């Protein structure tokens, strides 16, 4: 599933290129997770003002209303002035005077939803429960520690939940916990402020590094140019079960948490 780094890489790939463009047509393919919530022709003639990101959602601001776009489990976007005819997995085209933004989503768990503003019921439903943005100034250490202290679940599960901090997917949670020296099974409520500070910094560092590397391509992800990310090639623990830790040489262990694979070093992480 595309996580925060992949969504941010996607946003940066087309945001400036589509800004100011007039919408000429909207094509809808097979049904996605949620309906568009507006007749496609109602968007024709409107202009794209900017593209923002909130967690794993892209917010495409129009001169009236906005589109909330989620890539789902397997989605990716392309933006080009001359795209080929839509393929079997191309389910949404936003055709503008500057190019077409196309959503390819084989599993169809993604969605594009129109709302009038961020106070609209669907916007609140999709965005209202999201935690802090980890890459901006709003990622406050005190609030982060307080959020952890309220949760008795394993810290990795809390990171994945998205209501304390958004966008920390499975690979990034494993990597951040290793960098912070925290065992993924430790109850979040037991994390002291100094350890929370290390994890806070580690989450920032890992996600920023992942964006710099173009995200991670574990299965389907590619950016708007069709290129894969390569952060996963530099992972310190993720995908390395049985291999020696790069710090202490202890074999990396694999366990299952909530149906997700967790990788950690039993010596470096306490």
UniProtKB/Swiss-Prot annotation:
CDD domains membership: EcFpg-like_N (cd08966)
What residue intervals traverse the membrane? Answer: none
The protein's matches in SUPFAM superfamilies, at most eight in alphabetical order, are given as:
Glucocorticoid receptor-like (DNA-binding domain), N-terminal domain of MutM-like DNA repair proteins, S13-like H2TH domain
On cofactor binding, the record's note says: Binds 1 zinc ion per subunit.
Q: Could you tell me what reaction this enzyme catalyses? A: Hydrolysis of DNA containing ring-opened 7-methylguanine residues, releasing 2,6-diamino-4-hydroxy-5-(N-methyl)formamidopyrimidine; 2'-deoxyribonucleotide-(2'-deoxyribose 5'-phosphate)-2'-deoxyribonucleotide-DNA = a 3'-end 2'-deoxyribonucleotide-(2,3-dehydro-2,3-deoxyribose 5'-phosphate)-DNA + a 5'-end 5'-phospho-2'-deoxyribonucleoside-DNA + H(+)
GO molecular function per UniProt: 8-oxo-7,8-dihydroguanine DNA N-glycosylase activity; class I DNA-(apurinic or apyrimidinic site) endonuclease activity; damaged DNA binding; zinc ion binding
Cite the EC number: 3.2.2.23, 4.2.99.18
Q: Does the keyword Metal-binding apply?
A: yes
Where are the FPG-type Zn fingers located? 236-270
* Quaternary state and interactors: Monomer.
Q: What does this protein do?
A: Involved in base excision repair of DNA damaged by oxidation or by mutagenic agents. Acts as a DNA glycosylase that recognizes and removes damaged bases. Has a preference for oxidized purines, such as 7,8-dihydro-8-oxoguanine (8-oxoG). Has AP (apurinic/apyrimidinic) lyase activity and introduces nicks in the DNA strand. Cleaves the DNA backbone by beta-delta elimination to generate a single-strand break at the site of the removed base with both 3'- and 5'-phosphates.
Q: Where does DNA bind?
A: 89, 107, 151
Q: Which residues form a coiled coil?
A: none
**Keywords (A to Z) from UniProt:** DNA damage, DNA repair, DNA-binding, Glycosidase, Hydrolase, Lyase, Metal-binding, Multifunctional enzyme, Zinc, Zinc-finger
Q: Which cofactor does it need?
A: Zn(2+)
**Gene Ontology BP, a term:** base-excision repair
Q: What is this protein called?
A: Formamidopyrimidine-DNA glycosylase
Q: Which family does it belong to?
A: Belongs to the FPG family.
In its UniProt entry, the species of origin is given as Variovorax paradoxus (strain S110)
Q: Do you know which NCBIfam families this protein is assigned to? A: fpg (TIGR00577), PRK01103.1 (NF002211)
Return the InterPro entries for the record.
Answer: DNA_glyclase/AP_lyase_DNA-bd, DNA_glyclase_Znf_dom_DNA_BS, Formamido-pyr_DNA_Glyclase, FPG_cat, MutM-like_N-ter, Ribosomal_uS13-like_H2TH, Znf_DNA_glyclase/AP_lyase, Znf_FPG/IleRS
On whether Plastid is a keyword of this UniProt record, the answer is no
**Active site per UniProt:** 2 (schiff-base intermediate with dna), 3 (proton donor), 56 (proton donor), 260 (proton donor)
């Amino acid at each position: 599933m595309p996580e925060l780094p992949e969504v941010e890489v996607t946003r940066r790939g087309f945001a400036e290129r589509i800004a100011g463009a007039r919408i000429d047509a909207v094509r809808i393919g097979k049904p996605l997770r949620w309906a568009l919530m507006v007749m496609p022709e109602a968007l024709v003639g409107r202009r794209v003002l900017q593209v923002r990101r909130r967690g794993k959602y892209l917010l495409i601001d129009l001169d009236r209303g906005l589109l909330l776009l989620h890539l789902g489990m397997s989605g990716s976007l392309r933006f080009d002035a001359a795209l080929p005819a839509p393929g079997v997995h191309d389910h949404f085209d936003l055709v503008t005077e500057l190019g077409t933004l196309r959503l390819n989503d084989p599993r169809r768990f993604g969605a594009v939803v129109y709302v009038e503003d961020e106070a609209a019921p669907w916007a609140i439903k999709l965005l209202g429960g999201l935690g802090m943005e980890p890459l901006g100034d709003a990622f406050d250490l005190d609030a982060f520690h307080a959020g952890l202290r309220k949760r008795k679940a394993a810290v990795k599960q809390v990171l994945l939940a998205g209501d304390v901090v958004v966008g920390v997917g499975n690979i990034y949670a494993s990597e951040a916990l290793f960098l912070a020296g925290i065992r993924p099974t430790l109850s979040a409520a037991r994390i002291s402020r100094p350890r929370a500070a290390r994890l806070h910094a580690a989450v920032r560092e890992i996600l920023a590094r992942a964006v710099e590397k173009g995200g991670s391509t574990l299965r389907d992800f590619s950016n708007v140019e069709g290129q894969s990310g390569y952060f996963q090639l530099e992972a310190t623990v993720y995908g390395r079960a049985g291999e020696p830790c790069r710090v202490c040489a202890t074999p990396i262990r694999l366990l299952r948490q909530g149906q997700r694979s967790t990788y950690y070093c039993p010596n470096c992480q306490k």
